[in-house]
């Protein structure tokens, strides 16, 4: 334990998954907790340390400390791949498997730091197990769509004959995709992680957006489920090499541009790139497209659209683009972080979910009336003409006015959640758990 920390301060160890998006939301929550007499330790791999340092200002140098977590060494997974950022897709399972073996090093960290509380992520069954052996309370911070967590908990806790037929919110079932069945080992492990959470579960959402799903998850698991808000990074001071993007947007009319981005981890296929490019060109709507790498699939497209669009093959300041007055729509894979940012800035979503929880996030956005999912053909390929039609409806046409208004309404609610302090009930429950181990 650091002797410089005030004895009246509660020490909390946070353990996010090894993805930048997960680390980012834990870091936002950590910063908010430091205003309430909590000292935070954030554990991650050595490879992620520089990202964390880049996102920590001197303001938090005394209240948030970074702790390296050592993953087992492996010739198949060298040190530079101890992160999902830039991880080749075929190594995703290897990283997850190696991460599950980090328990012994995590135990050493906990013994040294002697925290009052551990806050862990979605896939770390070993973390609450290690904390329990040391008599340290641990809770889970779930950073995705609560509607999906409610479905998972339902599938695992109800008898098989009561599974989907009795789930009260069928509106979140994804389009043209298989629904998970009860008995899935992945769901079982995931729900076990939730059940290990001591008394409460924190969720990255709001009652206004997912109140009925939050209540159902709480009832199903028999635990308090407490929303902590969107936990998104605010638009930041721009670097010189990004100012030109804002100047380009400044020349466009209000709410006339669609932003296109599929996150830092999903790699679009050439077919997907061609379909999206065709749809954008057909829509005749201005766009900013952040793509991981330009390919031959874009040959001719960039010249044809001219000043109508930007195609950028490097990192872009997503929050700044979404918050710009010219941005009127967001073509997104519907990762939860991107979904939260879109809602935060009142921008309606043109949803193109690709994997994982994204189809459920897309359905939620349709259900609340702040987005439309683009349809696919019988082989799962995006419909080019429908891309154009949905973009025009969401950004331009009168028929999309209700969607635009709903997105703005949710944006105002999220803004208030961002500006407010952490909910008093959340702090009260965290203090109670810390005092159990004081």
Curated annotation (Swiss-Prot):
One of its GO terms (cellular component) is cytoplasm. This is Cyanidin-3-O-glucoside 2-O-glucuronosyltransferase. Involved in the production of glucuronosylated anthocyanins that are the origin of the red coloration of flowers. Optimum pH is 8.0. Keywords: Cytoplasm, Glycosyltransferase, Transferase. It holds the Pfam family UDPGT. Monomer. It is an enzyme of class 2 (transferase). Changing residue 123 to A: Strongly decreased activity. Gene3D superfamilies: Glycogen Phosphorylase B. Its EC number is 2.4.1.254. SUPFAM superfamilies: UDP-Glycosyltransferase/glycogen phosphorylase.
């Amino acid at each position: 334990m650091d002797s410089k920390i005030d004895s009246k301060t509660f020490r909390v160890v946070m353990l996010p998954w090894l993805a930048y998006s997960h680390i980012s939301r834990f870091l936002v929550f950590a910063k908010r907790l430091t205003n309430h007499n909590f000292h935070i330790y954030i554990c991650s791999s050595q490879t992620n340390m520089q990202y964390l340092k880049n996102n920590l200002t001197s303001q938090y140098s005394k209240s948030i400390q970074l702790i390296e977590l050592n993953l087992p060494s492996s010739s198949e997974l060298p040190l530079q791949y101890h992160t999902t950022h830039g991880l080749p897709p075929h190594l995703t399972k290897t990283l997850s498997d190696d991460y599950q073996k980090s328990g012994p090093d995590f135990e050493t960290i906990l013994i040294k730091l002697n925290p009052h509380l551990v806050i862990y992520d979605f896939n770390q069954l070993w973390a609450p197990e290690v904390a329990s052996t040391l008599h340290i309370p641990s809770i889970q911070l779930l950073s995705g769509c609560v509607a999906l967590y409610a479905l998972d908990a339902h599938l695992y806790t109800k008898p098989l004959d009561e599974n989907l037929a009795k789930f009260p919110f069928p509106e979140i079932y994804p389009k043209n995709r298989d629904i998970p069945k009860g008995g899935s080992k992945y769901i079982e492990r995931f729900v076990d992680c939730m059940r290990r959470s001591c008394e409460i579960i924190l969720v990255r959402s709001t009652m206004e957006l997912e109140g009925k799903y939050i209540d159902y998850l709480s009832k199903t698991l028999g635990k308090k489920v407490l929303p902590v808000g969107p936990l998104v990074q605010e638009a930041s001071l721009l670097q010189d090499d990004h100012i030109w993007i804002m100047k380009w947007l400044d020349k466009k009319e209000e709410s006339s541009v669609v932003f296109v981005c599929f996150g830092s981890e999903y790699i679009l296929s050439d077919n997907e790139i061609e379909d999206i490019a065709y749809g954008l060109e057909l829509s005749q709507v201005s766009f900013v497209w952040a793509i991981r790498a330009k390919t031959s699939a874009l040959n001719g497209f960039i010249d044809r659209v001219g000043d109508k669009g930007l195609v950028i093959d490097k990192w872009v300041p997503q929050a700044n683009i979404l918050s710009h007055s010219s941005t009127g729509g967001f073509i997104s894979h519907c990762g939860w972080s991107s979904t939260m940012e879109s809602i935060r800035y009142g921008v309606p979503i043109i949803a193109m979910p690709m994997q994982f929880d994204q189809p459920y996030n897309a359905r939620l956005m349709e259900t609340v009336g702040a987005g439309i999912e683009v349809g696919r053909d019988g082989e799962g390929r995006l419909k080019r003409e429908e891309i154009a039609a949905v973009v025009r409806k969401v950004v331009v046409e009168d028929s999309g006015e209700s969607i635009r208004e709903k997105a703005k309404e949710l944006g105002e609610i999220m803004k208030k959640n961002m500006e407010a302090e952490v909910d008093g009930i959340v702090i009260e429950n965290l203090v109670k758990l810390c005092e159990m181990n004081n």
